């Protein structure tokens, strides 16, 4: 039940014991003998040892799958690349401090490393960045030959559909990798201050884990004690070396395979207006998925003075078939210029 379910307390909780399992206080978890799901299982069911659990599952309905498909197809049509990788560079603990972005828990990838990785991948593959934060990838990004997609999607089930339709996932210690596992997708996961045994799927055939913190981290006893010394010790655990960046890129390329150009024809979805209307409003897949086209402000764009990301999910222009049709399209573009214009700073 959702916590706002009517009479949830009166009908289902009041006559029962109310338990609050704490997986981070399970001995097997903080000694790297089980993962988070197994720790919950032990705490809830009073087990002495972890047991093998079935793989997580996410069941998407048809509207979610359609929304994800349209978003990915639109990205392909704009970037002209047929293979798509979703990149989730940051975890929930990422913070924007003035012109900088940092993760005090060292679970997110370093910004410099992320930019290097994406700039290499975007040359051959379509890249969708799964992040609420906008950050520049390079100088003069507006003029870059290879653009990336930054859809601001608030519904995590739509993100699940995007990951499902995409060809590969690249992420850190965050929810994206678990979505990829639940959907049987391939994934490259970069970990730093946390242990793969606790938070990921080491040894799984579809997962490549790049352990940047191996040999230079200690377990952070979250929800048990506050240990500033450990946090300081782990401070550099997610700083990626050139060799580790190469490992990440090579893993993605191996999983994605040989790049190829997009040869399909993307038809933008249209949402029907009121029944009395004879015309339908033009909306792209991103808007139909619940996203909002908002210009980034100073609070959402780190590093003031850097170029604003120029990629918006716009509909590809159809080639005219004759002169009269061409003139008609020109008139249409004049009247609808704002809807089709790529953002410029």
Question: Language model features by range: what are they?
Answer:
Residues 319, 323-345:
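Basic, mixed-charge low-complexity alpha-helical segments
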Residues 25-74, 203-276:
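Leloir-type glycosyltransferase catalytic cores
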Residues 76, 122, 249, 253, ...:
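Residue-level detector of alpha-helical secondary structure
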Residues 1-36, 158-161, 176-178, 341:
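Active-site and donor-binding regions of nucleotide-sugar-utilizing enzymes
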Residues 271-315, 319, 323:
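Intrinsically disordered, low-complexity repeat regions enriched in Pro/Gln/Gly/Tyr
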């Amino acid at each position: 039940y959702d916590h706002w379910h009517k009479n949830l307390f009166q009908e289902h909780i009041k006559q029962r014991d109310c338990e609050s399992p704490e997986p981070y206080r399970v001995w097997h978890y903080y000694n790297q003998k089980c993962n988070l799901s197994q720790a919950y299982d032990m705490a809830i069911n009073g087990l002495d040892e972890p047991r093998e659990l079935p793989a997580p599952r996410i069941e998407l309905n048809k509207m979610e799958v359609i929304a994800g498909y349209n978003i990915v197809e639109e990205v392909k049509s704009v970037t002209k690349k047929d293979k798509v990788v979703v990149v989730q560079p940051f975890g929930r603990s990422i913070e924007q401090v003035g012109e900088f972005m940092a993760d005090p828990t060292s679970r997110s990838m370093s910004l410099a490393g992320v930019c290097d990785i994406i700039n290499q991948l975007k040359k051959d593959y379509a890249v969708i960045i799964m992040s609420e934060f906008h950050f520049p990838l390079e100088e003069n990004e507006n003029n870059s030959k290879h653009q990336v997609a930054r859809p601001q999607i608030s519904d995590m089930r739509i993100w699940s559909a995007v990951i499902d339709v995409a060809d590969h996932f690249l992420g850190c210690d965050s929810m994206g990798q678990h979505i990829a596992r639940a959907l049987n997708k391939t994934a490259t996961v970069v970990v730093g201050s946390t242990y793969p045994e606790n938070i990921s799927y080491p040894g799984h055939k579809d997962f490549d884990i790049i352990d940047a913190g191996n040999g230079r981290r200690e377990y952070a006893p979250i929800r048990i004690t506050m240990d500033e010394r450990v946090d300081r010790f782990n401070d550099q655990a997610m700083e990626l070396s050139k060799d580790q960046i190469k490992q990440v890129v090579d893993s993605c390329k191996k999983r994605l395979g040989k790049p190829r150009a997009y040869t399909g024809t993307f038809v933008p979805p249209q949402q029907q207006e009121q029944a009395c209307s004879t015309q339908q409003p033009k909306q792209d897949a991103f808007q139909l998925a619940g996203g909002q086209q908002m210009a980034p402000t100073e609070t959402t764009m780190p590093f003031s003075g850097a170029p604003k990301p120029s990629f918006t999910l716009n509909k590809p222009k159809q080639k005219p078939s004759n002169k009269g049709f061409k003139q008609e399209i020109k008139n249409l573009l004049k009247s609808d210029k704002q809807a089709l214009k790529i953002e410029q700073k």
